[in-house]
Amino acid sequence: MAGFGLPNFGQLTEAFKKAKQIQQDAQKLQDELENMEIEGKSDDEMIKVWISGNQLPLKVEVQENIFNSNKEQIEKNILQAIKKAHELSTTTMKERMNDLTGGLNLNLPGFDNSDS
């Protein structure tokens, strides 16, 4: 510590460098998540959906013979596929954010920090 309870200039400069690096890495991660295509499937694989690492829907694939099923089964399959894709996407985002922050507990909204 320098005089008056302030950190020395070298420590302050290093802290700013680290903050700038985290900011750059966060932008890179944002771009990476945006370009990901994460697939979720219904249990019977009749419905597949893809969402980005940012949880944006990208596309849906439906097997032709799904239309032989009843309405409730089709709805169930769609929901299963969406839930699985969303779960994989949020897990991926949390893991990548944890990698970025080095396990720091930043208490970011939308992230469960109790895992850290």
Curated annotation (Swiss-Prot):
GO terms for molecular function: DNA binding. InterPro entries: YbaB-like_sf, YbaB/EbfC. One of its GO terms (cellular component) is bacterial nucleoid. Disulfide bonds: none annotated. It comes from the Bacteria. SUPFAM superfamilies: YbaB-like. Binds to DNA and alters its conformation. May be involved in regulation of gene expression, nucleoid organization and DNA protection. NCBIfam families: DNA_YbaB_EbfC. This is Nucleoid-associated protein A9601_00191.
